[in-house]
Regions:
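Histidine-centered active-site microenvironments of extracellular/periplasmic hydrolases
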Residues: 383-416
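Feature for exported/extracytoplasmic and membrane-associated proteins, marking the mature portion
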Residues: 2-354, 358-368, 390, 409-412, ...
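Beta-strand segments within the central parallel beta-sheet cores of soluble alpha/beta enzyme folds
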Residues: 324, 374-382
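Proline-centered loop/turn at the N-terminus of a beta-strand
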Residues: 130-132, 378, 403
Length: 498
């Protein structure tokens, strides 16, 4: 499929460049082009629409509290009901809540039969001890707007501190880890790829190039089929224009030039990973494409193609190690369903769980000599908000805090954080669980929230080797406000990474 010139430029971070940082910091970033190198990969999976956390990590028993009783109060049975019974959850039991000791389960969709290589979904990865379930993830003064809340999570900036407006938390990591020499990434390399139509919020930055595409085999320089005789001249002109800009003494112009050149180089290099992967791993390619045949599976297939080429050193110039993809449909105001395999929420979780499971199997033999590289990969799963605690007629409305998942070969599997207090008397005026950073439990029965920035910080420090001081000075900013109600102290040891 041909792409337009406008789309071609949009495929990298060029479209996101701007004067969003202070002049001193901005110019300093451009002096350092390369990134601190490691052999690790990091993948972000976004559940678009607001995933219902209460029906994703479900109380099965009360423990010392009333979680199960409160769940049954808020979620009904019968026509339109989305409550799940303990019997329906028996196959997806995970750990217990750290505060109350109540038994928890993940949604039965995460134990779907799937296709060959994908059976068992996320539950099977839990059984292997490599799935972390992090409860009650949120931020202060939560927003019920899809766009605003997604922007908050992507920027890591709930209170809109100006130094971080317009750039993503991973984008700031990529820029902040630039080093002078030896250069694992040059000024025109691409450290990150988004399986999307344009660069997503997490990766927006003003110092590195990020590639956005849907299918590797479709990505290429936008030749003109009506005037093919002019194609070579147009590509030469493109290289000349952006090459001149790359040599500029102006930092902004230099970045634009390097981004244009990286786009043009990527159009020659990255599509090669498709043929290499399909030829060598046809059974997995078929399992993604025909076995599961879902958008999430196809997204992981594109990531697998790149990682395979990087691990085997098969395509010169391909060295991306940071990725993002998404799965939509989680805005379940109606017809959400419960444990029924035909239900909307079940199908969404089955799609995600089966795609991750198949990718997990693919990684087992992806390394040189068919070695297992799962210990090089960490996957973070998040959504812009959870859903309201009481259900509506047959679905759920916009909510506040909810669970995150982390999958990886070095992940310490388990349940982390406290399940939100869902007692109707403990909910706020929107019938959502409030954000709380004080004593656990709080004086009004509040359960301590896991600030999503502590999850990010744990990944940045324990997976990507940033110091806590660097994270807090260049990637994430602590809040100013009462300690019980705001993120005023970091905890970058949530526990899910060694």
């Amino acid at each position: 499929m041909a792409i337009t010139r406008r789309q071609f430029i949009k495929r990298t971070g060029l479209a996101t460049a701007g004067t969003v940082l202070g002049p001193g910091l901005f110019s300093n970033m451009f002096v350092r082009h390369a990134l601190a190198f490691s052999n690790r990969y990091f993948i972000v999976l976004f559940l678009d629409g607001g995933n219902d956390g209460l029906n994703t990590v479900i109380p099965v028993s009360n423990g010392s509290g009333t979680l199960r009783t409160d769940y049954e109060t808020n979620r009904k049975t019968g026509p339109g009901g989305i409550r799940m019974t303990p019997a329906e959850l028996n196959g997806t039991l995970v750990g217990t809540d750290g505060l109350t000791g109540g038994q928890l389960a993940i949604h039965p969709g995460f134990n779907d039969a799937g296709a060959a290589g994908a059976s068992g979904g996320l539950k099977s990865i839990w059984n292997e001890g490599r799935l972390a379930v992090i409860q009650g993830c949120g931020y202060p003064e939560y927003s019920l707007s899809h766009e605003e809340s997604r922007n908050i999570w992507e920027t890591g900036n709930p209170l809109f501190y100006s130094p971080y407006t317009g750039t993503g938390w991973m984008g700031r990591y990529l820029v902040g880890n630039a080093v002078s020499a030896p250069p694992p990434y040059t000024a025109t390399d691409i450290p990150a790829v988004n399986i999307a139509d344009s660069v997503v919020g997490e990766y927006k930055n003003t110092g590195t190039s990020v590639l956005a595409l849907r299918r590797l085999q479709d990505f290429g320089f936008p030749y003109d089929y009506d005037y093919p005789s002019e194609d070579a001249a147009k590509e030469i002109a493109f290289e000349s224009l952006y090459g001149t800009a790359a040599g500029s003494g102006n930092a902004t112009v230099k970045y634009i030039g390097n981004t244009g050149l990286s786009t043009e180089s990527a159009s020659q290099q990255y599509p090669q990973t498709h043929g290499v992967y399909v030829s060598a791993r046809s059974s997995f390619n078929d399992a993604y494409t025909n076995g599961l045949n879902t958008g999430t599976a196809r997204g992981f297939r594109e990531i697998a193609k790149i990682i395979y080429s990087v691990e085997r050193g098969l395509v010169s110039g391909v060295n991306a190690r940071f990725f993002q993809l998404s799965n939509g449909g989680y805005d379940t105001h109606s017809n959400q369903g419960g444990a029924d395999s035909n239900g909307q929420h079940y199908e969404l979780h089955a799609e995600v769980g089966n795609a991750i499971r198949l990718f997990w199997e693919d990684l087992k033999t992806m390394g040189a000599g068919n070695t297992d590289i799962r210990n090089k990969v960490t996957i973070l799963v998040w959504s812009e908000f959870s859903r309201r605690i009481p259900q509506n007629d047959n679905g759920t409305d916009h909510g506040s805090q909810g669970p995150m998942f982390v999958v990886g070969g070095t992940v310490n599997g388990g349940v982390y954080g406290s399940h939100p207090n869902i007692d109707p008397d403990a909910l706020d005026n929107n019938e959502n669980s409030p954000y709380w950073q004080g004593a656990n439990p709080g004086p009004a029965g509040q359960h301590r929230s896991t600030d999503f920035r502590d999850v990010y910080g744990t990944i940045l420090t324990r997976w990507l080797d940033m110091s806590q001081a660097t994270v807090l000075s260049s990637v994430l900013a602590l809040d100013a406000g009462p300690a019980n109600d705001y993120w005023t102290a970091a905890n970058f040891n949530v526990g899910f990474l060694p």
